Amino acid sequence: ALSEALHADPETAWNEHRSAARLRDALAARGFAVTAAYLGLETAFLATAGSGPVRIGVCAEYDALPGLGHACGHNLIAAIAVGVASALAPLADELGITVEVYGTPAEEGGGGKIELLDRGAFAGLDLAVMAHPGPVDVAEARPFAVAHSHVRYDGKAAHAGAYPEE
């Protein structure tokens, strides 16, 4: 439902007010402490759960392409981020982790993550993750100082930006 709501109401870079609010509300409803307008960026946010010393960042993108809507799948990235963080949150204290969801606006040409990085958003994170849809049936992982992973997806591959007819 979250992915569909975002898809039905696309907002472009730095204008993702309703999208950011939907995501903040979804995370708050799941027990996350939410900070809007994170680090002075109006459509960025931070949502946290747990209080462990190991900090895990989950990035959520939610801006749309001008004239194309969510052809790059940022509605999926955002919904997956909420799902991953929501699955980890109930285990956070037991695992000794803090789950941090970073709402990263303006990823379609606006450099939202760069702005957040420059403002210190990701300082001290032990791990940062994000899922992104793509045009092929493989998971490509480029980990730094971690083991490679192999994931099998079943279904038909399609990417709205690369293969809109599929």
Residue positions per predicted region:
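Acidic/His- and Gly-rich active-site-bordering loop/insert found
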Residues: A1-I97
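Histidine/acidic-residue-rich, glycine-tolerant segments that coordinate divalent metal ions
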Residues: T43-T48, D63-A71, N75-L76, L95-E166
